[in-house]
Amino acid sequence: MATNFNDIVKQGYVKMKSRKLGIYRRCWLVFRKSSSKGPQRLEKYPDEKSVCLRGCPKVTEISNVKCVTRLPKETKRQAVAIIFTDDSARTFTCDSELEAEEWYKTLSVECLGSRLNDISLGEPDLLAPGVQCEQTDRFNVFLLPCPNLDVYGECKLQITHENIYLWDIHNPRVKLVSWPLCSLRRYGRDATRFTFEAGRMCDAGEGLYTFQTQEGEQIYQRVHSATLAIAEQHKRVLLEMEKNVRLLNKGTEHYSYPCTPTAMLPRSAYWHHITGSQNIAEASSYGESYGAAQASSETDLLNRFILLKPKPSQEDSSEAKTPAQ
């Protein structure tokens, strides 16, 4: 967990090739890694002072990179090129051969995850490919301070079919905290944040958890799909139990459940709003649900984005008697 996280990987003066005119112009180039503030990108400023003044840079998102290469000296001296999968390229030259080599190695490792054949890089990490593959399923978030946790700051969020995990931004193998999806009472997002309320089932404790992120919509869709899958599993288990009870007690007046389900079932009293919301999600538009002004507190934000609770039917009323947390 990084409270003073710096997303700048490398920066310096270079001569960037113009896409329109094809000429090289001197600029201050900043390479930023992906974070809660945005994706991995190159930012081009007129000079170094413009960064401190927070001017509006020209941004090139570094995604879908095919390769990073050095141009031959006879073509362009001290030049580095980033080739994208659509065969477009961004090319720049450096003031020295040493600087060009540093840019090349940094971009290769950060954009491609490649381990260059250099003794200075040390022994290859055999687990690196698996870790990097898993990293693609993690989102960049900034956990805001909350009374239930001692940690806050920049981290990685991962959603599996059962849990939400937070991982350390510097060491992808260090798990910071986790929440079972079946402990979620409600969740929502806006343009810059993702928020959920967890019950007492989780180790982190009951409360609101808010994350600043540019990927709130993607996180929301992952969480919603996973919770719907758990709810469907819950429904199937209950139907199977009811079927078994009827078969075992056929012809008798007394009904009793023969055993408890083997699958972990959600125990939250708020759980039934998730299954019912699937039917009403298409009826309400995104603008109607999320077009209101930004809430003044985290609770107002969450209440504004909560999945709407459907009107209980006679059949649902029996399921709603699940013991509360």
From Swiss-Prot:
SMART domains: IRS, PH, PTBI. Pfam families: IRS, PH. Residues 7-112 form the PH domain. Widely expressed. Highest levels in heart, lung and kidney. Keywords: Phosphoprotein. GO terms for biological process: cell surface receptor protein tyrosine kinase signaling pathway; nervous system development; positive regulation of MAPK cascade. The keyword DNA repair does not apply. InterPro entries: Docking_Protein_DOK, DOK4/5/6_PH, IRS_PTB, PH-like_dom_sf, PH_domain. Disulfide bonds: none annotated. Residues 132-237 form the IRS-type PTB domain. A motif (DKFBH motif) lies at residues 265-275. The keyword Phosphoprotein applies. PTB domain mediates receptor interaction. Interacts with RET and TEK/TIE2. Interaction with RET is mediated through the PTB domain and requires phosphorylation of RET 'Tyr-1062'. Belongs to the DOK family. Type B subfamily. DOK proteins are enzymatically inert adaptor or scaffolding proteins. They provide a docking platform for the assembly of multimolecular signaling complexes. DOK4 functions in RET-mediated neurite outgrowth and plays a positive role in activation of the MAP kinase pathway. Putative link with downstream effectors of RET in neuronal differentiation. May be involved in the regulation of the immune response induced by T-cells. This is Docking protein 4.
